[in-house]
Curated annotation (Swiss-Prot):
Its main location: cytoplasm. The keyword Amino-acid biosynthesis does not apply. This is Histidine--tRNA ligase. Homodimer. The gene is hisS. Keywords: Aminoacyl-tRNA synthetase, ATP-binding, Cytoplasm, Ligase, Nucleotide-binding, Protein biosynthesis. GO terms for cellular component: cytoplasm. SUPFAM superfamilies: Class II aaRS ABD-related, Class II aaRS and biotin synthetases. Signal peptide: none annotated. It is an enzyme of class 6 (ligase). InterPro entries: aa-tRNA-synth_II, aa-tRNA-synth_II/BPL/LPL, Anticodon-bd, Anticodon-bd_dom_sf, His-tRNA-ligase, HisRS-like_core, HisRS/HisZ, HisRS_anticodon. Its EC number is 6.1.1.21. It is found in: Cytoplasm. It comes from the Bacteria.
Length: 413
């Protein structure tokens, strides 16, 4: 293999040391909080049949047209590395005939072929939350509250804004779509190429454009709130009232539509100004028609995903290493005893390391970090059934009988 290929693929990143522990902390904290809200953890493969995503994300979405990693396997099946979780979780819900209402938590890597930049990679990681089986506005409020709860415990609320919009029911969206198309057609030649295409295939997606020329045109675009039916207006009012009751601050943003076709009614993002253009830390909304569109029952649903890389870039986290035990056997017989002692201590839940070679006491101690507890033993200790316990942090050393060793270590770890 060429040396140039022996490195990370562009848009991917190795995780180790402090960064790995930060990722693990975010994931574990998110799952622990999800447990309080009644979620159960599930896992799906990172590969799915391509149809799982093309059938749900929208033929004109950026993910389907530009970003999915597709390939044919050796049997000729069209396979895709998952670009998002929700479609795969819905597939699981249908395949396993899960009884609703049910709340599902998942996490792991997702893959999109995008131009790598700060907080945007081709392989990145998400924690994902899906609530199937409730059409109540209060379910939307609770999901937003869950995201807010997680960001609060990550100590990020000072840097975060909750932005929310309401796309409405079918009647609302159809009326608004006609008005938006009528408005945008006046400026069709001035729109970006992507927006000209979306104007034909999915006009609401134009609202999602970050192009400066599009943003200028959209300043005077119709407001979807002017087209709400009574159902839509009442639903959104109840969502906002719920957020007010929980003292969760928010900003209305009628430009939020989300980039996937399955969203309806409530859509929201938790954003920050500290990550440049990749400003959404959490994003989600309601997708009541998705389960039915994939062949399942008519099942209302609401959910969101949180980007671990983006959260990791915002938080300060110092992993606290637990103190480990290092064996320093002196002599051949002590080496044999070390193998047995290491096994016994590990079976009792203690982290143990040793060198497997006798390179001299001073030399071995020099290579041990200050957070360790060292067990030194040679011929004399083997005869008296004792161990010398040295605390590298304090320099204190004491002789401990083998029968009291566990208690001595538990007191120091």
């Amino acid at each position: 293999m060429q040396r140039s290929k022996l490195k990370e693929v562009r848009g991917t990143k190795d995780l180790l040391g402090a960064e790995f522990y930060k990722f693990q902390y975010i994931q574990h904290l998110s799952q622990a909080i999800a447990n309080r809200y009644g979620f159960i953890a599930v896992d799906t493969p990172i590969i799915e049949f391509t149809e799982v995503f093309t059938k749900t994300l929208g033929d004109d979405s950026d993910i389907v047209t530009k970003e999915m990693y597709n390939f044919q396997d050796k049997s000729g099946e069209n396979i895709t590395l998952r670009p998002e979780f929700t479609s795969a979780i819905v597939r699981l819900l249908i395949n396993k005939n899960l009884v609703t209402p049910v709340k599902l938590f998942s996490s792991g890597p997702v893959f999109r072929y995008e131009r790598p930049q700060k907080c945007r990679q081709r392989q990145f990681h998400q924690v994902n939350f899906e609530f199937f089986g409730s059409d109540s506005p209060l379910a939307d409020v609770e999901m937003i509250a869950l995201g807010y709860n997680i960001l609060s415990e990550l100590k990020l609320l000072n840097n975060i804004t909750l932005e929310i919009n309401f796309l409405g029911d079918k009647e609302t969206m159809n009326s608004y779509r006609l008005s938006l198309v009528e408005y945008l057609n006046k400026y069709k030649k001035d729109l970006s190429g992507d927006s000209q295409r979306r104007l034909i295939t999915n006009p609401l997606r134009v609202l999602d454009s970050k192009s400066p020329e599009d943003c200028e045109i959209l300043l005077n675009a119709p407001n979807i709130g002017d087209f709400y039916t009574k159902y839509s207006s009442d639903f959104f009012t109840e969502v906002l009232d719920g957020l007010n009751d929980l003292c969760i601050p928010y900003q209305l943003n009628n430009r939020i539509v989300r980039g996937l076709d399955y969203y309806c009614n409530t859509v929201f993002e938790f954003t920050t100004s500290e990550l440049g253009s990749q400003n959404a830390v959490i994003a989600g909304g309601r997708y009541d028609g998705l389960v039915r569109s994939m062949g399942g029952n008519d099942t209302p649903a609401v959910g969101f995903a949180m980007g671990i890389e983006r959260v990791s870039a915002l938080i300060d986290y110092e992993h606290k290493e637990s103190r480990n035990v290092v064996l320093v056997p002196i002599g051949k017989d002590a080496m044999s005893y070390a193998l047995k002692l290491a096994y016994e201590l590990r079976c009792k839940g203690i982290s143990v390391g040793w060198n497997y070679k006798n390179t001299g006491l001073k030399n071995m101690l020099r290579k041990i970090n200050d957070n360790s507890i060292v067990l030194i033993f040679g011929d004399e200790e083997l005869k008296s059934n004792t161990v010398q316990v040295k605390d590298m942090k304090t320099g204190e050393q004491q002789e401990v009988e083998k029968g009291n060793l566990l208690d001595a270590l538990y007191n120091k770890i």
